[in-house]
Amino acid sequence: DGKKVVIGANLDDKKFDVAVGLALHEGSHIKLSDFTLLRNLENSIPQEIYVLGEKMGVDRYTVLSTVKSILNYVEDRRIDSFIFKTSPGYKSYYHSMYEKYFYSKNVDKGLLSDEFRTEEIDSYMFRIINLHNKNRQLTALKGLKEIYETIDLGRIQRGLMRDTNEAFN
């Protein structure tokens, strides 16, 4: 809702750093993300994107959901980069979170395998949300290299993406 972060009560010592990293990340969304833009995202997406989706057999809701997921990925990288630069004491928690969700053996296996190589939304989304993983395969899907270059993780990591609106555009 853009106002609070809820953490589950079932935390053991092994999961604590991951949970703290996730809570810090989600809390940073509250401080840094533009929730007005996110609430109005459906109307911010150019109509031609919906038309293109329809031509490819993708309904309006799926277009919206996909754009929202990609925006969230870019926004996550922007926020995490900001926190890394401004709050270095939190890095270990973020590293724990990244190890669990992005750099796990299962993610690496999926990226290196023949899976998620069909030109459909799920394959693209798996590959996109793991573009910052060293095992990304930019030739796994048509256009993935261009998507990677458009997102420009290096620019984000240098702190050159200022806000949610810039992440969207």
What are the functions of these language-model segments?
Residues 1-169:
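Short, functionally important secondary-structure microenvironments
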